[in-house]
Amino acid sequence: DKVFEIYPFNTLAEQNRHTLETIFGKTEAINDIAVVNSLTPIRGRGNVEEDPEKYYKEALLDRQFLNYPFILSSHVTFFRTLFGTGKEDIMSFFQLLNSVVVLDEIQSYRNAIWTEIMIFLNSCAGLMNMKIIIMSATLPDLSQLVDGKCNVVKLIRNPEKYTLHPTFANRVICNYELLQEEITLDRLRRHVLENMQLREKSGAKILITFIKKQTAYDFFHRMKEALGEQSEWQLKLLTGDDSIYERESILKPIRENVWKKVILISTQIVEAGVDIDMDIGYKDISKLDSEEQFLGRIARSGIKNGIPGIVYFFNLDQAEKIYRDDYRMEKSLTLGNEEMRTVLKEKRFQTYYEQVMHYLKEMKNRKTSEEGLEYFFSESLKKLDFLKIQKRMELIEEDCWHVDIILCRKLVMEDGTEKDGRKIWEHYKELLSDYQMDYSEKKVKLSECQSDLNLFRYQIKRNIQIPYNEMIGELYCVYDGEQYFQDEKIDREKLEGDHMYFIDL
């Protein structure tokens, strides 16, 4: 009865909402499409002025019960609906009956629970008459992890017809010369500057991706120093530190080709699904499916002017320390192994995933401890221990070491309107303290206010010395947030000087 499109990040749901607007924007169908996540305000139907009470009650009930024909949401929200024990999780669960669910970028799930995911999805599809479509650039065959019958149909019988077609396969050249040497940030900078010099006349869009956030910051400062103030090249930095506003102010001009000469330094947040088309890429190696995702950001529209895109891989930070529990970080499964370079070139990811599945079965699925499958199904699932099931199936493990902080300042939006963080914060406080307002109206208005607050929201490490002005629950607010920005970019050094430290990864 419903269609769910599920993405790894909230921003991708909004991005695809805009894509659907170009298709259905002039029809009534666009009103049936809703984005459901923590960033998007609750949407009502009709005119609020005609009957406010009815408007707000229906809007809240629609959100709580997912009463929309077409829903765009995130992996986290979907898995809470499927396995969560909260009130709203339970209220929306029945909407999965008879639905079509499209799971995009499935390789981004924690592979420690791939087996459990496949077993549950297979069972739910049968019991609830769901059609689940799994999508990914690399598409692991997770049915291999399930003992017994798994009702899986491969929609593309001959994927090589597309992946090996010259238009697709030859659009990007992978270069491994930097993997042959002990790379440093200074050596990488020289290499990038050489490529910039070669493209000085024609221009180019260069994407440089690091695993660690601090490394991205360090390289950004090195490049800024090398370019100087008079350079024609736009130098941008995009990490998990950036707010939604900052992220879009960087990506939109790149998408629309406003900048002909641009260097975007980033962490891996640009890999999965972000709609940008770059000419040259540099990437610190990690998981093989991450490398393929990165290739999808290069020469996205095909070969330009007879020149294919090119990606230089290097090995700087130790990815295995970051992805500690990910079996895909076995050295033999990375680009450090020449066999994996062939797999990447020929798109033979089934060969790669066969080895990953072997590791999963041998290292985890056969365990008899609490981490093993047998223990989980006999002690948690069979005994209907819903809290333990919910905990096991969390896609993102709970992080108790960070807090959210609102850095108030004034932002000019694309349409010319101004958003004042301090005024939005005051409005947020007023709504919370208004005990006379109807519950439905309050929930809807709070969702709208929180959506605006997200423009000023940042995550930092938990620290009792945070120099905040106000605190509501565990949400901190700094009135003069502008002091922590320089050239429209968060000043990490200034923040850390005031004992506010960003999350490292």
Residue ranges and their predicted role:
Residues 138-199:
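Interdomain hinge/linker at the junction between the two RecA-like core domains of SF2 helicases
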Residues 34-46, 211-214, 235-248, 266-271:
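Conserved helicase motor
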Residues 64-68, 85-99, 261:
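Short basic/glycine-enriched coil/helix segment immediately N-terminal to the Walker B
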Residues 125, 190-204, 209, 214, ...:
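C-terminal helicase lobe and adjacent C-terminal extensions/tails of nucleic-acid helicase motors
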Residues 90-100, 107-165:
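Post-DEXD/H (motif II) to motif III coupling segment of the RecA-like Helicase ATP-binding lobe
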Residues 26-83:
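Inter-Walker segment of RecA-like/P-loop motor cores
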Residues 2-24, 37-40:
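Conserved Walker A/P-loop ATP-binding site and its immediately adjacent core
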Residues 81, 263-278, 293-301:
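SF2 helicase motor core recognition
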